[in-house]
Amino acid sequence: MLLNIIGEPKDTESVFCYIPNFITDKEVEKLKTTLSHIEFIPNYNYTETKIIRYQKWYQQDNKYFCNKWGNKYKRWESNEYFTELENFQKLITARLKQYNFEKLGINIPDFNSCLINKYLENNYIRPHRDTDKAFGKEPFIAGISIGSPAKISFKRVLYKGHNKGLSKQDKKKYFLNFSWNLEPNSVFIMAGSSQKYWTHEVEKKNNKDTRISLTFRKQI
């Protein structure tokens, strides 16, 4: 397990954790057949001219990804949980609770959403912070990796009370930037003030094997 805890202003902390072999091949197999039948929707770059990955948004209360956004896109419309996903979410929640994150002052939420991303060759996710308008200022985020490995990078940015947009990189603390390799069946976790002071990105895939990620959060 990798754990990176970074002290932040106002006595807060950004918490990052990586746990390899968090789920088993057998547990993944229960999902794979269903995942293979999902009709994923393309996600594009900022100019909506190039596909950068494919996705499907699931929310147990049928909520749009972020109702406070000005523009609406089909890819962020809610889909109903299927049985295998609901069972998998329960499994993930129970297993996370075994790691005693409460000792770090972090509680495991009752997840109510899952964003499933599919990455093909040359796909990626650009640097971003998960919007506080949908998930609050200090969300607990758990990302499961299935299939091809990937590299995730975290970069320090300035925070001015909200995390709209990318903001400017914190050049005085760039030395804190770091990256992790995400192996199949692993989970990476972001919590505390991580979505205030850090962007994260999944770098461009350079192989032809498909990668699937499932990101669990509690939408407010």
Q: Which residues fall in each region the model found?
A:
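Non-heme Fe(II) oxygenase metal-center motifs and adjacent flexible, charged/small-residue loops
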Residues: 1-220
